[in-house]
Amino acid sequence: MGDGGAERDRGPKRREEPGGRSGCRGEHRGAEDLRADTGSTSPREIAGTSASSPAGSRESGGDSDGQQALGETDHCRRILVRDAKGTIREIVLPKGLDLDRPKRTRTSFTAEQLYRLEMEFQRCQYVVGRERTELARQLNLSETQVKVWFQNRRTKQKKDQSRDLEKRASSSAFEAFATSNVLRLLEQGRLLSVPRAPSLLALSPGLPGLTAGHRGTSLGDPRNSSQRLNPMPSASASSPLPPPLPAVCFSAAPLLDLPASYKLGSSAFEPYSRLEQQKVGSPGQSDKKADI
């Protein structure tokens, strides 16, 4: 009896063992099939699909639930990537063009609002606190819109001021350059227009007290000059000569009247002057001899 009961107890166990073994084999086969199916795909794509699909929320746990709670928009795609250190990072990529993404609408101000904002900016460039709240209420705008408008207006004013300073600096530099060029040209013109010494022919007709004979002596041969110089002592005795004129320049000095006692020291006029002196002195000597 005991042996029969023991055999009965062993029977179901033996029957269960093949079933249990078959169940384990089925699980191993399912894992192998899954590996074969996923062998062609990369682990990045598997992670991406698990993060983007709702079924992957069970594996990721509370983190994926929080991401789904934040809301995954239609224009973004999230991918989980494991780097070389083993940490998993999330990358957000756009699904389509950036133009498809919804953008913030720009605030369009009316002419009245712009006029009022400009007047307030001219009065005070920084509007804060109650003033900004009251201005936003009067213009039917939000405080953020008023704040952003004032920020943009201050930035524009700074740009305009810097541009004006650059223009003034460039204009002043140009004026200084032009002035230096004009001064340089004037200096060059003054140096080039230095008056030259007047020539002898230009000064000879304008000098008073010069006769044609004197001009002939200055320009003629020495013989004529010796004959023309003879009447000088008699003329000086009868009427006094006018005082000599000051020399205009060094080139006009030979044209002045020479006094009677002046003796020419040049070798060309010496023989003629000696002959004339002997002729003039001979009548006086004869008179002295007669008196004796």
From Swiss-Prot:
Residues 1-74, 212-241 are annotated as: Disordered. Transmembrane segments: none annotated. Residues 38-55 have a biased composition (Polar residues). Residues 1-36 have a biased composition (Basic and acidic residues). One of its GO terms (molecular function) is DNA-binding transcription factor activity, RNA polymerase II-specific. PANTHER family: HOMEOBOX PROTEIN EMX-RELATED, VENTRAL ANTERIOR HOMEOBOX 2. Belongs to the EMX homeobox family. This is Ventral anterior homeobox 2.
